[in-house]
Structure formats: C-alpha cells, structure tokens
C-alpha cells in the first residue's frame, strides 16, 4: 500500500492534526503495533487497537470518526507500559514506542495553543531486542539471529547476538545442520532475506521450530553495505579487525548490527566484536534428539522435568544462563572438557569453600544485563548499585580462595579468581555518587548523593530549607534598612515580596529595592536576590532532577568505559557459579568424574538417569542402576524386553550421561570411561507431523534417514522401535537393514531397542552386535519388572500384561490372550522365527498372516435381522445371547 492509498483508507485529509501525525508515523512502521504517547497513556488506533485489546485484555473504545465509521481505540497507562509489553513480546509482536519529545507547554511556546506536541518513535521492541529484566521472562539467552544462505554453497553463515548481555557470535553452519543449530540456540527472532520467504527452510523454521522470522529486503544483506556497517560500528578501517570471516559472515554480522541500530534508534548498543565459533567445537544434537532427551525443556516446552531443571542449582541468573549454554553445546575437545572437569573436581574436593562461595554468590547481581541497560540509556541508579554491591561481594569471594590457599591456588582456579579483584576506581565512583535508596525512575529524583556535587547540595538545601533561606534574607534586609517591622510575604499575583509600612517607605534608599506595589497601609518591594531565591525555590525540584540526570549520564559513561572489566568479572562469577553447582550436585547425588579415552569406549558402571532418579527420590523410591559397556568390539547393543521395563529410560540415560560428561560435570554413575561423542542422535517415539501432512511412520523414517546420513564413527545413536507403524514384514526388514548399515558402514556406538525378536539372531553374523534384555520375574500370570539390563534376548514383550496394568477391560485382555495363543501356535507350527539365517537371500514373506476365527457369538449375530424381530422375540434372543456369552 502506497501513502496515497493509506491516506485514503484512513481519511487522512479530514483527520485532526494530531491524528495526521499518528498516521504519518504509523505509515513508517506498518509492520509494528504503534503505541502512541498521549499525556499519561500510550494509545493505539484502528487495527492495532482491535488486536491489542484482545491480546492485552483491555477495553476497546472509540475516538472520533473516519467517514461514517468510528475509529477503534485502546490505551495503557505509561507507568504500566512494561507490564503490557511483556504480553505483546510473549506473543511475538513487534512494537514501536512513540514518545512525546516535548511538553505541551513547550509546544505552545513553539507554535501557539493549536500546536501539536512533537512525537516520534524512540524505540522498536521485538522479541530478539528486549533488554528490560521484566520483559525477559526466562533464564535462557535472548538471541536475535541473522541467517545468510548463499546460493550454490553448502555452508550458511549464522550470526547471533544477545542484546541484553551485549554478546555476539558468528558461525559457519553446514546446510544440513541449519535447523539443528537453530534448535541449539533457540533464537527469539531470526532475520531472513525476502527471497527465502517461500523456501522449505523458512517453512521449517516457522512451523517445525516455531521461531519468529523477520524478513528483510535482499539489499539489507548486501556484502558491501554490511562491511561498511561493521567498519563504522566498530570504528575500524579494515574488516580483518573482526577476524578471518567469509562474505556470508560479513552479511550476517552487518545485518544484525543494522537491525539493532534501526530498532534502538539513538541508543546504540555497546557490543564487542563478534566471537567466531567453530561449528565442530561442540556436540551436534539435532532438533528431535533435544526434544526426545528433554535437555533444556520438557516435551511440552516447559522447564519442569527437563535435564536443565535437575542440574540447575545455580544461585545467580548469569550462572543459570551459562549452564543453559553448556547443556545446549557440550564440548568435543577432550582437552577443554578435562579443563572444566579439573575445576569441578577442585570445588568437589573443597566443599567448605564451595558452600561459602555459593552463599556469597547469592548476593551478586546480573551485572551483564545491568551494564547493557546502563550503556543503552535504559538503566537506573539501582543498576549502578547492583554493580557496586557485586564488586564488593566478588572481592569477598576472592578472599575466600586466598585465605584457604594463599599463593598455592591451582593455576586453573587462579585464572577464574583473578578477575574478582575489586576495581576501586569504579567502586568508589558509585559509592560516592549514588544514593543507597535510589529509585528506579530518574524522574523521581533522589538518585545522586547530595555530597557528590555542590550544586546538588545547594538545590536540596533550597528544597528542604526554603523558609529558612527566606528568614535569613529578611534579617539581612532589616539590618540594611533599619526597619524592624520589615517582612517578606507571598501572594499568587506577585509572588514573594518585601513588605514595609507606608510610614517607613522613606527609609528605602538603596536602588536594589525595586518597587512593586503600593497599598493603603504598605509599600511592597523586591530585589534581584529575592527574585532569584523565588525562582530557585520554584524550580529547585525540576532543576535538581535535571542536574541529577546530567550527573547520572556522566557516571554511566565512566562506568561504560569499564565494560571490558565488568564483562570479564561477570564471566568469572557465572563460571564459578556453574562449577560450584556441578560440585554441589555431585556431592548431593554421588556423581563421579568421567574419564575420556581416544577410542570408542562407552563404559558406564552403575549409571542412572538423573531426572528419573530425582523424581523417584521425591517419592522415597530408589532408581535401579545399570551398566553399559560399548566398545570397538561391541559397538551395538540390541535391546529386547517387555514394555514398561525401562528400555527407553536406559537408552536415554546413557545419552544424557555423555552430554553431562562433555559439559564438564561429574556424572550419575559409579564410574564412566567415554570416548568423545561428536554427535548424539535419538529417535525415541514420534508424533504425527500434521502441519506437514506426515504420518508417524513417515516422520520416523525421515528422522532415521537423517541419522544415517549425518552420523560419524564417533557418534552415539539411540534408536527405539525402528520400523513400527507399518506391516510386520516391512518393519522387520527396515530395522534389519538399518542395523546392518550402522554396523557395517557407520561403525559407531548404538543402542537399538526393538520388539522384533527376529532381529536377535543377527548377532550370529554381526560380530560387533550383542543382545541385551530387561530382567523380569514371573509368578503365574504376575510379572515383576526388575529394570536390570542383562545379556541375552527376550522372546516375549508382555504387552498384554502392560495393557492390563493400563486398565483395559478384562474382556479385552482375555480376548487378546486368546488371539496371542493362536498366533503363537501358528508360529510354532511354521518355525519360530519369521527370518532365517540359512540363506543370504532372506525369505521375509514365507509365512502367511494368521487368520482370526470368528467366535460363536459373531457367527450368531450374522444370522440376525433386527427388523424382522418382534419385541418378544428380541427379548428372548437377548437372554439367549447373554447365556451363551457367559458360557464362552
């Protein structure tokens, strides 16, 4: 829609000047909800009002007319804006904040009483650009990402930034891994080029991952333009100052910086240069595996029951974010993993230090986000106080280490403790300038200490002692004039004035006394001093707030110069918090340090699933531990056994142990020897992808296909029930061939659970595969699941027993047992296994499907025509059927 069409639609020419101003600004921000400041409210009009009233649950009213139609309107109080913004951001809306740039009085002075207050958009808030604490509802990073996919190349460039913590990264991502990488980062907003709008990639990002996409014209990502943006932003002359980056990475970085500049207007973020990430430096975990293993969220998208919720006993917000990043990105460099494990072991071996440090960490603040708000002019005195208190506490934490170890601290601990040394210059600046009870809002005043600046002291003295100053001036004038009856009074017409009786008027000879008014009984004067005092008294509150703002801005600039120091300090505190957390969890839950090898070992003794164990502990139940011994010689475990016996839990727990080990934590096991895992794939269950029109079987086959295509020798594959959802023969065939492919081609570690017992014979010709099953105890028809993994193969799945536990009607259970018995007799007569190893050309379809015989009741029903029965005959037949049913 062009501007002329827009003007016609909204009746621009007939609108008031204020509404024309609104429409001008709205046209420039058509992709945003426009919140338009009018006095004490932010108002919305037309479609914005209708949409916002529904989302926010506020009343929809009217304001004026557009032709014959009333204009919808709704509004929110300015002081409650952030509460409403939270809801809009949660719903992924883009919001433009239009503020008044002058007061109504200033507008009148500028253009008369009909003048419209100047307004303009001061900020655009999007899900990926929020920095306010109450707008960021989770402890995870709040990433804005830009994805650049060059044509005819198999690698994309991804830049991602968390504005709230002033961090920015760039990485080259293999094309096949784009969705997996986005699933790792979970960005709140992704910038994409317009030409990708109809692509499968955009569709998958939007529908499968459910991430917000903001499309930009193709020129937004032009390499020459983006390079200039980077150079200007970082005040560099050569792009090599960022590092060795490709043209695609230049486009990704430049587009993010441009978007941040456009949305933040004058408040340009103080971002460091992008950190270049090596894609292969962390474990690949695809989208489905993250969901199946419930690493950082549960299957419903919440936190409860996730691995993160179990492991997260951090005591700071920045520590929680770092743990989230650790779990999202386990390392693949064993040297770096062992460096982390060394730190964890130090805290685990010094639990007294750990306990003291954790108590002090609770007193620190999220100074990363405090610093961002300060540098972007959205901070408060409390943010500065938070930094001061954290500096003080960090120094106390440092002293704990040196009091216990002196100069004998291990080098890897000294490295993370060294940044805790207090920056006295910064500490003293805040200590001397900011009031301990500073309000959040600068407009309330009381942020700057009176003693920090003489003018502040003077103004507060005026505010608090105005009457005293008037009395002092009165006494001075009495002495100068010799008039003891001289008074200083006030009225609403002439303000403060010197009042003397008429008979004393002849004593006023000094020209500094300026005549103001004569009455019957008195003469009134003023002086330049009195006028200044009156002006100062009237304007003192306004002046002190204005002066405090100036001083506050100067203090913030000086604090911003210490950004590098504060970021290093924040990083140190968050790291200490995470490693103390690892030590705490290990001591509370009997975790042990894993050992890393250079082979395909995966030797876990008495391993446990941490999330399930935590849930059982709350019920005062014990978790049944299990071993897992994968190696070069025994890479594949084929696991058979009953439903509900714990196969899926066992497989998940081993994948989770690998993840926990490679983030640098101790693991829930008696011992663990692990060859580094570069990728984990888990296909355990799948829901129908109704959006894409895919069945459960199709979804599972797509996942399995991706696993086989992307796995390497160092990968760990977890597969459960491959081949289900189709005919038995098809399913067995697929599962068989997948096992062969993993064994012969990929040669990686794999846990493979199945109900196809025919597969158990494959250990005869797949030397690196072994059969394992779940131990049970049978007593008559009763079955006890022991949850122990033992060598061997199961010959039954006990599905009917599980169905009975689920509460299926007894008649259904009895009928199922009858049918199962017929199947088993039929199978016994034709050979136990559907598959045979006698021939390389396996006869998969040699056995016909058993046919079920109809019961006598079913045969009887076939002979009945209800329309030909009289009521009496129908009743007699009902009794007869009941009698036969009881006999059956």
Swiss-Prot record:
GO terms for molecular function: ATP binding; ATP-dependent DNA damage sensor activity; damaged DNA binding; mismatched DNA binding. SUPFAM superfamilies: DNA repair protein MutS, domain I, DNA repair protein MutS, domain II, DNA repair protein MutS, domain III, P-loop containing nucleoside triphosphate hydrolases. ATP binds at residues 641-648. Keywords: ATP-binding, DNA damage, DNA repair, DNA-binding, Nucleotide-binding. The keyword NADP does not apply. GO terms for biological process: mismatch repair. This protein is involved in the repair of mismatches in DNA. It is possible that it carries out the mismatch recognition step. This protein has a weak ATPase activity. PANTHER family: DNA MISMATCH REPAIR PROTEIN MSH1, MITOCHONDRIAL, DNA MISMATCH REPAIR PROTEIN MUTS FAMILY MEMBER. HAMAP family: MutS. Belongs to the DNA mismatch repair MutS family. This is DNA mismatch repair protein MutS.
């Amino acid at each position: 829609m062009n501007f002329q069409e827009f003007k016609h639609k909204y009746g621009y020419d007939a609108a008031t000047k204020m509404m024309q101003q609104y429409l001008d600004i709205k046209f420039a921000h058509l992709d945003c909800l426009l919140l338009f400041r009018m006095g004490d409210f932010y108002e919305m009009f037309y479609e914005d009002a209708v949409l916002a009233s529904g989302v926010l649950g506020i009343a929809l009213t009217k304001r004026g007319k557009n032709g014959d139609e009333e204009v919808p309107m709704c509004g929110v109080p300015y002081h409650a804006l952030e509460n409403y913004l939270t809801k809009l951001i949660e719903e992924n809306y883009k919001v433009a904040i239009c503020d008044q740039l002058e007061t109504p009085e200033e507008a009148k002075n500028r253009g008369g009483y009909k003048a419209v207050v100047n307004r303009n958009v001061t900020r655009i808030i999007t899900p990926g650009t929020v920095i306010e604490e109450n707008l960021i509802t989770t402890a995870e990073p709040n990433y804005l990402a830009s994805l650049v996919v060059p044509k005819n190349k198999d690698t994309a460039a991804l830049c991602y930034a968390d504005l709230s913590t002033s961090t920015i990264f760039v990485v080259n991502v293999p094309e096949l891994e784009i969705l997996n990488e986005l699933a790792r980062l979970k960005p709140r907003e992704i910038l994409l080029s317009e030409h990708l709008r109809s692509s499968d990639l955009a569709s998958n990002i939007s529908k499968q991952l459910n991430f917000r996409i903001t499309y930009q014209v193709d020129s937004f990502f032009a390499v020459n333009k983006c390079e200039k943006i980077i150079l200007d932003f970082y005040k560099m002359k050569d792009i090599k100052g960022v590092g060795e980056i490709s043209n695609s990475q230049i486009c990704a970085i430049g587009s993010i910086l441009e978007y941040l500049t456009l949305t933040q207007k004058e408040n340009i973020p103080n971002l460091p240069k992008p950190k270049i990430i090596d894609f292969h430096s962390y474990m690949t975990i695809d989208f489905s595996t993250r969901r199946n293993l419930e690493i950082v969220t549960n299957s419903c998208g919440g936190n409860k029951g996730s691995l993160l919720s179990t492991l997260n006993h951090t005591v700071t917000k920045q520590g929680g974010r770092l743990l989230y990043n650790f779990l999202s990105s386990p390392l693949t460099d064993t040297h770096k993993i062992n460096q982390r494990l060394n730190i964890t072991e130090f805290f685990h071996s010094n639990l007294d230090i750990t306990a003291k440090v954790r108590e002090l960490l609770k007193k620190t603040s999220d100074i990363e986000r405090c610093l961002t708000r300060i540098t972007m002019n959205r901070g408060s005195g409390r943010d500065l106080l938070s930094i001061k208190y954290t500096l003080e506490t960090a120094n106390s934490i440092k002293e704990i280490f040196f009091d216990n170890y002196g100069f004998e601290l291990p080098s890897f601990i000294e490295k993370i403790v060294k940044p805790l040394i207090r920056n006295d210059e910064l500490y003293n600046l805040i200590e001397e300038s900011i009031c301990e009870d500073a309000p959040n809002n600068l407009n309330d005043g009381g942020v700057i200490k009176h003693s920090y600046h003489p003018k502040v002291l003077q103004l507060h003295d005026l505010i608090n002692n105005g009457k005293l100053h008037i009395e002092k001036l009165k006494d001075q004038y009495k002495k100068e004039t010799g008039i003891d009856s001289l008074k200083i009074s006030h009225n609403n017409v002439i303000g403060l004035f010197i009042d003397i009786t008429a008979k004393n008027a002849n004593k006023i000879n000094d020209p500094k006394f300026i005549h103001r008014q004569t009455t019957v009984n008195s003469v009134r004067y003023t002086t330049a001093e009195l006028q200044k005092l009156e002006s100062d008294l009237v304007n003192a509150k306004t002046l002190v707030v204005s002066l405090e703002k100036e001083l506050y801005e100067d203090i913030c600039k000086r604090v911003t110069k210490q950004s590098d120091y504060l970021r290093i300090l924040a990083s140190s505190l968050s790291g200490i918090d995470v490693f103390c957390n690892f030590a705490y969890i290990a001591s509370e839950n009997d975790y042990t340090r894993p050992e890393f090898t250079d082979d395909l070992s995966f030797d876990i003794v008495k391993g446990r699933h941490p999330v399930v164990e935590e849930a059982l502990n709350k019920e005062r139940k014990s978790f049944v531990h299990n071993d897992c011994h994968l190696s070069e010689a025994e890479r594949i475990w084929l696991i058979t056994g009953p439903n509900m016996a714990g196969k899926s839990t066992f497989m998940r727990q081993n994948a989770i142990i690998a993840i926990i080990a490679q983030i640098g934590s101790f693991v829930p096991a008696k011992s663990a020897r692990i060859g580094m895992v570069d990728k984990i794939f888990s296909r355990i269950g799948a829901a129908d992808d109704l959006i894409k029109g895919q069945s459960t079987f199709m979804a599972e086959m797509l996942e399995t296909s991706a696993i086989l295509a992307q796995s390497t020798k160092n990968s760990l594959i977890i597969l459960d029930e491959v081949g289900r959802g189709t005919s038995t023969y098809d399913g067995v065939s697929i599962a068989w061939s997948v096992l062969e492919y993993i064994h012969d081609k990929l040669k990686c570690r794999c846990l493979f659970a199945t109900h196809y017992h025919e597969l158990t014979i494959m250990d005869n010709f797949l030397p690196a595969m072994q059969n394992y099953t779940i131990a049970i105890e049978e007593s008559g028809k009763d079955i006890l699941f022991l949850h122990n993994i033992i060598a061997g193969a199961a010959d039954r799945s006990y599905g009917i027993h599980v169905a009975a536990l689920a509460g299926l009607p007894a008649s259904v259970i009895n009928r199922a047992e009858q049918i199962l018995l017929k199947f088993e007799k039929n199978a016994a007569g034709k050979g136990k296994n559907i598959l045979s190893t006698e021939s390389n050309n396996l006869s998969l379809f040699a056995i016909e499907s058993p046919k079920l015989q109809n019961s006598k009741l079913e045969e009887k029903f076939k002979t009945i025509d209800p329309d030909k029965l009289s009521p009496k005959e129908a009743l007699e037949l009902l009794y007869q059927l009941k009698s036969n049913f009881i006999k059956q």
